[in-house]
Curated annotation (Swiss-Prot):
Gene of this entry: carB
Binding site for Mg(2+) 2: 298, 300
Entry superkingdom: Bacteria
Upper classification of the organism: Bacteria, Bacillati, Bacillota, Bacilli, Lactobacillales
SUPFAM superfamilies attached to this UniProt entry: Carbamoyl phosphate synthetase, large subunit connection domain (SSF48108), Glutathione synthetase ATP-binding domain-like (SSF56059), Methylglyoxal synthase-like (SSF52335), PreATP-grasp domain (SSF52440)
Entry protein name: Carbamoyl phosphate synthase large chain
Chain residues that bind Mn(2+) 3: 820, 832
């Protein structure tokens, strides 16, 4: 079937902010889809609330709306744009749920908008647990015994009948939210209650647990003419029972026989055909390791995290083709863009092994619950390609950026055998390292397989890695063993440790012995046809397939896996940098390890190397490509940390030089620079041990802000009020030493703002100043920010512009820099300078219409601002108000406190724009799912130091008709000041009348909870905060955010005053 001519305009719904379970893979899918539809000549309208994405760039669609993905706003856009059709299957769960809502509201029918791709009935059949069960029974496909329940009692009754353990799966939720494995009645009671609340249709599936089966996934495609094929099949290293997003995954499957492969393939194709899915679909199956018995676990009728992985693992662009199928093209009409010669109807064949390892946020959340189950917890993932399992697994381990270069955590050698076994059985995010340690201690693969239900085949590979370690240790300098270790993915640094030499020495031995990697092409067809993709991975074998081009090239380092503090914003900057390199006439080469992102789409750059971002792996590419230089400004801290070792090895770093990067990051050098430039900063000192820290704090005066130097996203930062707290911080939070000093600064309570600037060494362009809504003390990544600034005087703005220019020129900055200021009594202080692109680049680029990363890249390559037609100084402000608001994933992370402070906790962001501050704030709150009704009850539980300020907020809430509830101390303060309050217990002896109980009953619409500076003592507050999050009740832990919400509520309510 040729493409449809009866539709011209298509609306695509994006997936909104990044949360755990729905990350950058949808930016990649949405970007591909929009471009794919434009390529076919359709007009595309895009709606997405997340500014940090490539897909919300003007050139991706014909009309781009950065608006909340809620019925209210999407309906307005539909009425305004009147598209012929809507494509919802590329926006993750958000897009699907929105399509469902629009359809149920009758709006699609009223406007005559057709749904493209998979039909709603099919989405319903796959997502609604009851309909799915019926369909599987009709097809004769086995599913675990299960029961659909709408009440907790029904759940308990069913479980009593089939026996524990059982799995709870709420309907229509994302990333296993609200689900879990229950091994007894108490656990089921709690999880089922929560799951029913979270499910938008109050429905859960309770099923017999098949934990311990092998988990196999098939990524399948089907078109409107019923052609269907398997793009990729993948096998989880971890058995069923751990969410696939949290599992280590290999592609293609490693341990199943051809018969099993065909059996599961047939089942997957049968299911996608029965559901009549048009586009991509992911089928998860459980296979009994001891027989040919299997079960269908679930089907995702949309592009998913697994399809991003499958696309990158095979080179087959699923989202791009899904969009073409949606407009009527068939697989036998679409040319496979990888080979450029075969059609898309070919099933990809792989002659390599791909390993994916999830990246977890527990380096940020030390108290988080690390146990893994059916609810996803990873924020991102890495992928590595090799010629064998050992190679791809070890490359993936060193891509994780958790301070390891091998499947080994040095600290585990101290762990007792009992503890080791406990960690292997009760699965945590770092189980791979515990299993590897057990093998080093002589436990056999069979013993471990018995405990973990992981296939012995994989454990044998871990044993093989250990055997090579032994061989290396006993054959120092032996080139045969060295070659074997390299072919199995060992890093130079690991070999160096075993040989007791430096990694440089190992590298030299390799060069002398000609043991160098070759680069192989990812071509979808195991080299059977000619292929046109410049997409490579390294391995130690024969025949190098990557040829250095005659054109001068520039290498851009990506930012690795998505984690808290280093999100998709850096990928955005990387992609823009590549565009600018190409526009300047150079060949652009990207190196990155993240399968979810746009930067690792092989059509973005001239060459893509899918490799770990380590010194060794980067140097190997540089040796081959001999680029003009390397750009490290856009890859976050990952890339910046490589600047010094690369520069020492004689590599040219383009843009700001290493010595100047050091001046911004090293405390003493930075203070020196500020003195020379005559710029004030909060008084501070560095300390290399506990006593020095105490002495510094006495001199400066409490409160102080303490943090280690050289970190991203505010890791291990705290505001400390007294000596006892400071001592405990120095003992527990950081390991201070002369090499790694701790910074002790005076903590100034003032307004915070930040600036991104672009400099060519002579002139400095400041696109705009962003003013934070929360005062200093909340990490900039977790603050709401307004552009243009709403409360700064002209004098302060001029000072900020002046200091920014002095800093950029004084630090010899070429390209980008980000500066954070705090303002108190009209006095401006510099808090910190980051000599690189920051996480605000996408937001500021969108609201000022300056493609900042592109401009910075052109300057890095030697052009000037004047040549690019940009003025020196502060860019004129826009007349619209734009708000950037953070989005958190606390509901996925048990035991992580949602209290905001100097350590970053948000996973994503949204933007709200309008003509007034109140309207922009309203949109930002709606987009970040903080919805407050016009009236209801608000609970105040406030620390002593902010009761006075909270009183004014409470009075404003009362004026618009809210009921004011408060806990004991706060209530008596409010009553003494003439405000009528209902007293409520924090955590009561009668657990039917305390705050968590009222939250459960839906009696509380918002909670405002601040904590004194001694944060640790607040156990009750933590329980209240987590119950608010579990039940989706808006929670404000900073009074400034509550004030912003009040502005919105006040602007929406009429004034009713007696005369």
């Amino acid at each position: 079937m040729p493409k449809r001519k009866d539709i011209q305009k298509i609306m695509v719904i994006g997936s909104g902010p990044i949360v755990i379970g729905q990350a950058a893979e949808f930016d990649y899918a949405g970007t591909q889809a929009c471009l794919s539809l434009k390529e076919e000549g359709y007009s595309v309208v895009l709606v997405n609330s997340n500014p940090a994405t490539i897909m919300t760039d003007k050139e991706i669609a014909d009309r781009v709306y950065i608006e909340p993905i809620t019925l209210e706003f999407v309906a307005r856009i539909l009425r305004k744009e009147r598209p012929d059709a809507l494509l919802p299957t590329l926006g993750g769960q958000t897009g699907l749920n929105m399509a469902m809502e629009l359809s149920k509201s009758g709006l699609l029918e009223e406007l005559g908008v057709e749904l493209l791709g998979t039909k709603l009935s099919a989405i319903d059949q796959a997502e609604d647990r009851d309909l799915f069960k019926q369909l599987m029974e009709e097809l004769g496909q086995p599913i675990p015994e299960s029961e659909i329940v709408n009440t907790v009692d029904e759940a308990l009754e069913f479980a009593a009948g089939i026996g524990y353990p059982v799995i709870v799966r709420p309907a229509f939720t994302l990333g296993g939210t609200g689900g879990g494995i229950c091994s007894n009645e108490g656990e089921l009671q709690e999880i089922a209650e929560n799951g029913l609340k979270i499910s938008p249709v109050t429905q859960c599936l309770i099923e017999r647990s098949i934990a311990g089966f092998k988990e196999i996934e098939y990524e399948v495609m089907r078109d409107g003419a019923d052609n269907a094929l398997v793009v990729c099949n993948m096998e989880n290293f971890d058995p069923v029972g751990i969410h696939t997003g949290d599992s280590i995954v290999f592609a293609p499957s490693q341990t199943i026989s051809d018969y099993e492969y065909q059996m599961l393939r047939d089942a997957s194709l049968k299911i996608i055909r029965a559901l009549k899915i048009e586009g991509g679909c992911n089928v998860q199956l459980a296979l009994d390791p001891n027989s040919f018995k299997y079960y269908v676990i679930e089907v995702n009728p949309r592009v998913s995290r697994s399809s991003a992985l499958a696309s990158k693992a095979t080179g087959y662009p699923i989202a791009k083709l899904a969009a073409k199928i949606a407009v009527g093209l068939t697989l036998d009409e679409i040319i496979n863009p990888v080979t450029g010669s075969t059609y898309a109807m070919f099933e990809p064949a792989l002659d390599y092994v791909v390993a994916k390892i999830p990246r977890f946020p527990f380096d940020k959340f030390e108290h988080g619950e690390r146990r893994l189950g059916t609810q996803m917890k990873a924020t991102g993932e890495v992928m590595a390609i090799g010629r064998n399992i050992e190679e791809s697994l070890l490359k993936a381990c060193r891509s994780l950026e958790v301070g390891v270069d091998h499947n080994e955590l040095p600290a585990l050698s101290q762990v007792s055998d009992d503890e080791l076994m406990r960690k292997i059985v009760k699965v945590q995010d770092d189980r791979l390292f515990y299993i590897s340690e057990a093998i080093r201690r002589g436990y056999s693969p069979d013993e471990i397989a018995e405990l973990t239900k992981i296939d012995v085949f994989f454990l044998d590979k871990l044993l093989h890695i250990y055997e090579i370690e032994q061989e290396l240790a006993s054959h120092i300098g032996d080139s045969y063993v060295l070659k074997k270790a390299k072919q199995n993915g060992f890093a130079d640094t690991k070999i160096a440790t075993l040989w007791d030499m430096t990694a440089q020495q190992v590298r030299r031995i390799r060069q002398d012995q000609k043991i160098m990697p070759v680069y192989k092409m990812v071509d979808t067809c195991a080299a059977e046809f000619e292929s046109a993709t410049p997409y490579f991975y390294s391995t130690y074998g024969f025949e190098n397939e990557s040829v250095k081009s005659s054109k001068e090239s520039v290498l851009v380092l990506g930012s690795g896996p998505i984690r808290i503090g280093q999100g998709v914003e850096f990928d955005y900057a990387t992609v823009h940098s590549v565009k600018a390199i190409q526009a300047a006439g150079y060949e652009a080469i990207i190196m990155n390890s993240n399968p979810e992102t746009v930067s690792t789409d092989f059509s973005v750059s001239d060459k893509l190397y899918f490799e770990p971002l380590t010194f060794e792996d980067v140097m190997n590419v540089i040796d081959l490509e001999q680029p003009k230089g390397v750009i490290v400004q856009f890859g976050g801290q990952t890339a910046i940390n490589l600047a010094e070792p690369l520069s020492k090895a004689g590599v040219k770093i383009l843009g700001t030089q290493v010595a100047d990067l050091d001046r911004a990051e090293d405390r003493d050098l930075f203070e020196q620079a500020l003195k020379e430039l005559d710029i004030p900063q909060p008084p501070g000192q560095t300390a290399t041990n506990e006593e020095e820290a105490i002495e510094a704090a006495r001199k400066i005066g409490f409160p102080v802000l303490v943090r280690p130097s050289y970190v991203l996203g505010g890791r291990a930062m705290e505001i400390v009020e007294n000596e006892a707290d400071l001592r405990s911080y120095m003992r527990t939070a950081v390991k201070a030493s002369p090499d790694h000093p701790v910074l002790v600064d005076s903590y100034i309570v003032g307004d915070e703002c930040e600036v991104d600037a672009i400099s060519d060494g002579r002139q400095v362009l400041i696109p705009g100043i962003m003013e934070h809504i929360e005062r200093a003390g909340v990490h900039s990544g977790d603050s709401m920010a307004a552009y243009p600034p709403q409360t700064l005087s002209q004098k302060v703005k001029d000072t900020i512009a002046d200091y920014t220019k002095r800093l950029a020129l004084g630090l010899n900055c070429i390209g980008m820099m980000n500066i954070q200021f705090v303002i108190k009594d009209e006095q401006v202080y510099v808090i910190e300078v980051n000599p690189r692109a920051s996480r605000t680049v996408p937001f500021l680029s969108k609201v000022t219409d300056i493609p900042m990363a592109q401009v910075a890249t052109r300057l890095i390559l030697g052009e000037t601002l004047a040549e690019l037609d940009y003025e020196d100084g502060l860019h004129p402000e826009s007349f619209m108000v734009h708000i950037k608001a953070p989005v958190f994933s606390f509901s996925k992370l048990a035991k992580v406190d949602s209290l905001l402070g100097p350590e970053m906790k948000s996973t994503g962001e949204v933007m709200g724009s309008d003509r007034t501050l109140e309207k922009a704030l309203y949109k930002a709150f709606e987009a970040s799912y903080l919805h407050l009704p016009n009236f209801g009850n608000v609970v105040f539980t406030i620390a002593d130091d902010s009761k006075e300020e909270a009183l004014q907020l409470a009075q404003r809430f009362a004026n618009i008709g809210y009921g004011i509830w408060a806990t004991k101390g706060t209530a008596s303060y409010f009553e003494n000041h003439g405000l009528h309050v209902r007293l409520v217990e924090k955590i009561g002896s009668d657990d039917d009348k305390d705050i968590p109980a009222y939250i459960r009953k839906g009696k509380i619409q918002a909670i405002i909870n601040t904590v004194g500076t001694k944060r640790t003592a607040d156990k009750h507050g933590q329980i209240i905060r987590s119950s608010a999050i579990e039940h989706g009740v808006p929670l404000f832990t900073a009074l400034d955010t509550a004030d912003a919400m009040l502005k919105v509520l006040e602007s929406r309510s009429f004034t009713t005053e007696a005369i």
